[in-house]
């Protein structure tokens, strides 16, 4: 299986979610199922069916997280420098609107565009990889063709 690139903070966040699911959510849902079972006939017991559905979701998420974490290739951006690569925090200016944007290029499981965390597999990240400060890049986005100039690259 292919390794999954991830920052240390992304890895820690997924580990914390896994711990929460295993130590808090799973025991709570087992207790809820047991309580619902005590109410009698399971065929018409909405609480029981709801709890079982939630248990299925929790177990699926635990399995997914364990798989992702087992394949994680944790890359510490503070040890990197130079042209843009995984982990870089990149400040760009839109050449059409002069709007500045800062994104950090991260793995797909930690990406969150609202928090400035850009999936390495996204069109913008793929266009930026290997580029340097001062370079211009053309990116085909869902909103149309965009031109960006790279203002700065940081690894922190």
Curated annotation (Swiss-Prot):
Biological process (GO), any one: regulation of DNA-templated transcription elongation
Superkingdom to which the source organism belongs: Bacteria
Entries under InterPro entries matching the protein: GreA/GreB_C_sf (IPR036953), TF_GreA/GreB_CS (IPR018151), Tscrpt_elong_fac_GreA (IPR006359), Tscrpt_elong_fac_GreA/B (IPR028624), Tscrpt_elong_fac_GreA/B_C (IPR001437), Tscrpt_elong_fac_GreA/B_fam (IPR023459), Tscrpt_elong_fac_GreA/B_N (IPR022691), Tscrpt_elong_fac_GreA/B_N_sf (IPR036805)
Keyword set, alphabetical order: Coiled coil, DNA-binding, Transcription, Transcription regulation
Entry coiled-coil feature ranges: 46-66
A GO MF label: RNA polymerase binding
Keyword hit for NAD: no
Signal peptide: none
NCBIfam families in the cross-refs: greA, PRK00226.1-2, PRK00226.1-4, PRK00226.1-5
Family: Belongs to the GreA/GreB family.
Listed PANTHER family: TRANSCRIPTION ELONGATION FACTOR GREA
Function (record text): Necessary for efficient RNA polymerase transcription elongation past template-encoded arresting sites. The arresting sites in DNA have the property of trapping a certain fraction of elongating RNA polymerases that pass through, resulting in locked ternary complexes. Cleavage of the nascent transcript by cleavage factors such as GreA or GreB allows the resumption of elongation from the new 3'terminus. GreA releases sequences of 2 to 3 nucleotides.
Protein name: Transcription elongation factor GreA
Gene expressing this chain: greA
């Amino acid at each position: 299986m292919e390794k999954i690139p991830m920052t240390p903070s992304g890895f820690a966040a997924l580990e914390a979610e896994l711990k929460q699911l295993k130590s808090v959510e799973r025991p709570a849902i087992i207790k809820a199922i047991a309580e619902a079972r005590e109410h009698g006939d399971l065929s018409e017991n909405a609480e029981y069916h709801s709890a079982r559905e939630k248990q299925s979701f929790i177990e699926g998420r635990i399995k997914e997280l364990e798989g992702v974490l087992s394949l994680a290739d944790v890359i510490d951006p503070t040890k990197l420098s130079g042209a843009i690569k995984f982990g870089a925090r990149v400040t760009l200016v839109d050449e059409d609107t002069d709007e500045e944007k800062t994104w950090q290029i991260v793995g797909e499981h930690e990406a969150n565009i609202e928090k400035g965390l850009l999936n390495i597999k996204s069109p913008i990240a793929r266009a930026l990889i290997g580029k340097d400060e001062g370079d211009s890049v053309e990116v085909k986005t869902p909103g149309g063709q965009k031109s960006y100039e790279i203002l700065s690259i940081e690894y922190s």
